[in-house]
């Protein structure tokens, strides 16, 4: 690596940035979907979407920050960049709002319950294509 090379031009760093942007947009859409569910269905029914957001967003943020740390190498965990502090804060948030497993359990339990109801109603594959709150 030449000292003049820009970090973005090395290896798969362009792909890492692309994946990060796509994941950030997916997280934003998921938060918007949870907010819409709160407005339309009410807080009690929207708790499944809220749990999904609480599980997904901090987890994906940690992944994105981790990729940035990898991209920067040893400098990524130094005090030259805020990445180590960002990762630490996001990892703490994953525990502060309840373990990820609890949020995943809420989503999975609702998914199984909705799937069983769809099968007993004869909807079968239609449920798999749209989910319980499909537009």
PLM regions and their residue ranges:
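Alpha-helical interface subdomain recognition
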Residues: 3-135
């Amino acid at each position: 690596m030449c000292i003049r090379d820009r970090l973005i031009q090395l290896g798969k760093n362009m792909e890492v940035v692309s994946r990060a942007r796509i994941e950030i947009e997916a997280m934003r859409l998921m938060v918007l979907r949870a907010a819409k569910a709160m407005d339309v269905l009410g807080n009690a029914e929207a708790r499944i979407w809220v749990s999904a957001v609480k599980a997904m967003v901090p987890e994906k943020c940690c992944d994105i920050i981790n990729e940035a740390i990898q991209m920067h190498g040893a400098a990524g965990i130094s005090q030259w960049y805020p990445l180590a502090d960002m990762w630490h804060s996001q990892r703490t948030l994953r525990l502060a709002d309840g373990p990820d497993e609890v949020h995943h359990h809420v989503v999975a339990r609702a998914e199984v319950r909705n799937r069983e109801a769809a099968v007993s109603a004869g909807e079968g594959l239609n449920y798999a294509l749209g989910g319980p709150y499909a537009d």
